[in-house]
Structure formats: structure tokens, C-alpha cells
Amino acid sequence: MVFAALDPLGVPLGTAQASFGTDGIRGRVGTLLTPAFILQVGYWCGQVLPDQGPVLIGMDSRSSGAMVASALTAGLTAAGREVWTLGLCPTPAVPGLIRKLGAAGGLMVSASHNPPEDNGIKVFGADGAKLSPAKQGLIEAGLRGEAIGDKGRPTITSCGPAYQRNELLSHYRDALLASVLHQRLDGVPIVLDLCWGAATACGAEVFAALGADLTVLHGEPDGRRINVGCGSTQLEPLRRAVIERGAIMGFAFDGDADRMLALDGHGRVVDGDHVLYLWGSDLQDRQALPQQRLVATVMSNLGFERAWQQRGGVLERTPVGDQHVYAAMVESNAALGGEQSGHILSAAHGLCGDGVLTALQLATLCHGRGLSLGEWLDQSFQAFPQKLVNVRVPDLERRMGWQHCEPLQEAVLAAEAAMGEDGRVLVRASGTEPLLRVMIEAADSAAVEFWTAQLADLAEQHLNRGCV
């Protein structure tokens, strides 16, 4: 029976303006993410997720994480769901444990690479994949106060139980080691930047278990310093440590450890495109890459695409967001895909972005070939000059509707015409931050600088002054 959503929790519904972005619901704690709103999110997740099995909740190290997880637990149990909280863990641990334990779904409390004052909620279904847009829409409808199948006001007899199950993280650690067949890294000098975040739960532990000679930066959970001047968005601390310690590789993670960027021994960046090329080449050499296909996003470098084509490979591009990469990989039966930013998805390892697993794969593949990461990088490709500028556009309507700004659209067309087949223009409104991202890529670095400045200036001038 379907009932109207008439305040089943005693909390006013329909007042929060929130929706799923490219990576869940995300925002400033105390502004969007209030206890009352988070409780509603938990409740409506409980209505939408399958009825059988527990719902798992993991979290990164943010100071607000306990509040968010507690409010989600209250909402889920009010919907009659059984909740197992995992404590501090990387995001990929949640979908991995969903599949292993037969859970109904899971939620990860994290704002990924965002600053400490933000937080977010990622929702996974019973298959371990992020919820489909249709199911996300049902949760959004519930938050607006619309009828989606509410079971009525919770009662003492209808509330579900909640259990703390931190010990389950050991299954994830075991899976990480099994992913590289327990290959050894004895004495290999490696630096890890754990970002004060979720990677501190197991990152150093698994590398140490393989015998690596480790240097660990930002290696304790710290909710006030997560992502601050460190991790995959701030590589300079890792670069200094790699060079000073004479390491042959270094890995930096973001706040929830679902992505990773690497540095070679000279401090050169190994981004997601390079990881896809190197790991994909290994799979191709072993005839383990169906259709010679890799899946990447529109952000991936043109130099990567052309080099992969020269190897006889196919590069399929998707919109930005690992959920789009996931969908394309499932549809085309691809073995490997990911984003330039460092989200890498492997069909053999659960099709979920996993920074620690990717770092282990890269380290063991290099070591197994008798190469340093720099030597292997030299065998990859020469990236086209590429520049990304973030233009702050707080107004959501103007940001999402940038295509209707005639001066900006005309400049985009002019840039594309000027660069021809040797360049690309990508303008994209962020789904998680108040930013318009302007990316220019071309064989000519001067063209990159010129058109990036032109488009960024036009976006700043017009979108923040009422062009749309």
C-alpha cells in the first residue's frame, strides 16, 4: 500500500534543496547537512533499498562523520532497517562488503577530496554499484515530501537494530592483498600520503605486509586536517618526500581513498590516464583485455587516446563521473576504466574506484617487470599540454546553464575552430562544488594558455553578472 509522505519522522519534509550530484549528496555541514536533513536521507534510503539484509555505513575521518553516520543510522532504523556501522574505512570497502555479506546496500559518509568542513553521502545498492538515477530520484522525491511508498510513522516495534561491526574491515584488507596474489615488495622504497583520511585505516598496513620500505605521510586520521595541503589534490609534500628519501615511487590518496595519483622517483605525476595506459598495456600483453577496450572520460588526455590507438586499442569516452565509467564498462564488458583524476575501476576487482588497490597493482606490476615507476612511465605516452581552470560560479542555475551564455558559447566555438583536430575544449559545471571547469588541450602549449585565459575570463565576467 502506498501512503503519502506526511512527516513520518516528525521532521518537516520538503524543505531541503538537495539532490544527487556526480558523487552522491554533498555539501557544507550545518548548512545543507543538518542532523534533521541527514535523518531524512537515511529514512528514504531505507525505503528505497531492498528489504532483505543489513545496510552498511562507513565513514572517512571528518570531524562531522560521527554525527552524519548517527543521523543516517537513526533514519534507517526508523524505516525498520538493520544497520551495521563499519567505522573508519575507504569508500571501496563498502561495496566490497555489500557483495561479500549479501547486504541490502550501503552508505559512505565522505566528501571525497572536499575540505574538512564539507561532508557527503554516497549510496550503494545490493549489487555494490552506486544507485541508479531512477532510485536516486525516488530518494529525492521523498526528501521533497512526495509519496514513494512510505510505510508510515515508525513505532517501537517497527524500528530496526544497529550494530558496530568494525571488525569487518579485515575482509577488505584481505581482498587487497589477494588482488596482487600476495606478491612481495621486499625493500622497495615507497612513500604513501594518506591524507589524514580513510586510507589511514589500512593503506600502510597492506604495503607493509608485502615488505615495502615505507615512508608514511599524514598517516593518522584527523578530521580537521583531511585533504588540507596534502593528498591527491596537493602533491608537493609527497614530491618532496619521494625525492628526499630516494624512493622509486609515491602514492597520494584523497579523503575517502577511492582514487590515487602517483609520482615516480623524479617527482613526475602518474595520473589516471597513465595508470590506464600502463595497466591496460599489461592486460593487453596477457590477452586479458576484451576488445582491446579501455573506458575513460571526456577529461582524458588526447595524447593518451592516440597512443592507445597506436597500440591497436579502443578508448571509449564517457561523461565525467565514475558512475558513467561503471555503466559503460558493464555495457561493453570492458575490463578496465577510470578517470584522469585517479579513479580506476577494474572488472576483476569489483568495478569500484579503489585508490589503495590501484597503488598496489601499479607497485607490484612495476616490481614484477624489474622496472622503477619512472622507467615504466617512459614507455607510456607523451601527454598533450592541458590546462584546467576552475571558475567560481555560486549560482547553480547560471552554472548549470552556461551553454546559454552567448559570448562564452561563441568563444568555445572559436577555440575549437582555431585548434582543429589537434585540440579540445571542455567546459563543465561541477556537480559537487560551485565551480565551472574550463579545460583546454592542444598540441601547442601557447594555444592552451591563450584559450584557457579567454574562456575563464568570459565565464567569470558573464556568468557571475547575469548572462544566463
UniProtKB/Swiss-Prot annotation:
Instruction: Enumerate the residues binding Mg(2+).
Output: S112, D254, D256, D258
PTM comment: the record says:
Activated by phosphorylation.
GO biological processes: carbohydrate metabolic process; peptidoglycan biosynthetic process; UDP-N-acetylglucosamine biosynthetic process
Q: Which reaction does it catalyse?
A: alpha-D-glucosamine 1-phosphate = D-glucosamine 6-phosphate
Provide this UniProt record's keywords sorted from A to Z.
Isomerase, Magnesium, Metal-binding, Phosphoprotein
Q: Name one GO cellular component term.
A: cytosol
What domain of life does the UniProt record list for this protein's source?
Bacteria
Q: What is its EC number?
A: 5.4.2.10
The terms under GO molecular function for this entry are: magnesium ion binding; phosphoglucosamine mutase activity; phosphomannomutase activity
Q: According to the UniProt record, what class of enzyme is this? A: isomerase
Stored SUPFAM superfamilies? Phosphoglucomutase, C-terminal domain, Phosphoglucomutase, first 3 domains
Q: Which residues form the signal peptide?
A: none
| Residue numbers carrying Phosphoserine | S112
Which residues are responsible for catalysis? S112 (phosphoserine intermediate)
What protein family does this chain belong to? Belongs to the phosphohexose mutase family.
The name under which this protein is listed is Phosphoglucosamine mutase
What species is this protein from?
A: Prochlorococcus marinus (strain MIT 9313)
What gene, per UniProt, encodes this protein? Answer: glmM
